[in-house]
Each structure stands twice: as C-alpha cells, then as structure tokens.
UniProtKB/Swiss-Prot annotation:
Top-level division of the source organism's lineage: Eukaryota
Localization, UniProt: Plastid, Chloroplast thylakoid membrane
Protein name: Photosystem II reaction center Psb28 protein
GO term, biological process aspect, one: photosynthesis
HAMAP family linked: PSII_Psb28 (MF_01370)
NCBIfam families per record: PS_II_psb28
Subunit structure: Part of the photosystem II complex.
Family statement: Belongs to the Psb28 family.
Taxonomic lineage from the root: Eukaryota, Cryptophyceae, Pyrenomonadales, Geminigeraceae, Guillardia
Topology within the bilayer: Peripheral membrane protein
Keywords, in A-Z order: Chloroplast, Membrane, Photosynthesis, Photosystem II, Plastid, Thylakoid
One Gene Ontology cellular component: photosystem II
UniProt cross-references to Pfam families, sorted A to Z: Psb28
Length: 116
C-alpha cells in the first residue's frame, strides 16, 4: 500500500493534484503536489505532531522532501504545496513506481500534457 504522510505515522487522506516536469534528457525531474484542505491542517491534527516534510511511503521504502509550504486564505490554512525533486533517472524511475502504486490504491489516472 502506498501512502503520503506529513506527520510520520499519520496518513493523509486527501488526494493531491500532482504535476510532473522532466528535463529533455530525462536526467532530472520535479513533482509538485497540491493538497486542497488536507486533513493534516485540521486543528486536532496538530496534537499528533508537527509537519516535518512529505513522506511518500510504499513497500520499497520512503521518499522524502522537506520542501513543504502551507497556503493561507484570510489567515486560515487552505492547502499544502510540496515539491519533490528527482536528480537522476533512477530517482525518476523510483518515484514513478511509487506513483503507480499510489494511483492504483486511490483510483487516479495519468494524463500526459500536450507538447504545443
């Protein structure tokens, strides 16, 4: 089972919008995750701990990014944006294996962008 966590041990139930970019030679890439009203921002979640990063966890292990930012509207948290950077083809392949598992577990689909 593939899960996303912001506080270790607490699974995030909100499904993110994920945008991928990749260099032309395939050596690097970026995944931007946008969560609208994630569970971790609810008041009772703060009792469980602080957000220390975004953890992508599956049977192979975990991928971690510390590039996590909250989005506020009128002083209240409304969303989270996290950026995961892949610095090699191996990192990209590992990330895609995680996303395949996460997609299967959550009924997501992949839509390739047009090159126009």
């Amino acid at each position: 089972m593939a899960v996303i966590q912001f506080i270790q041990g607490v699974n995030e139930d909100v499904i993110p919008d994920v945008r991928l970019t990749r260099s032309r030679d395939g050596s690097t890439g970026t995944a931007t995750f946008r969560f609208a009203n994630p569970k971790v921002l609810e008041a009772q979640s703060s009792v469980k701990g602080n957000i220390t990063g975004m953890y992508l966890i599956d049977e192979e292990g975990q991928l971690v990014t510390r590039d996590v930012n909250a989005r506020f509207v009128n002083g209240k948290p409304q969303g989270i944006e996290a950026v995961y950077i892949m610095q090699s083809k191996e990192d990209w392949d590992r990330f895609m294996r995680f996303m395949e598992r996460y997609s299967e577990d959550n009924g997501l689909s992949f839509t390739k962008a047009n090159n126009s």
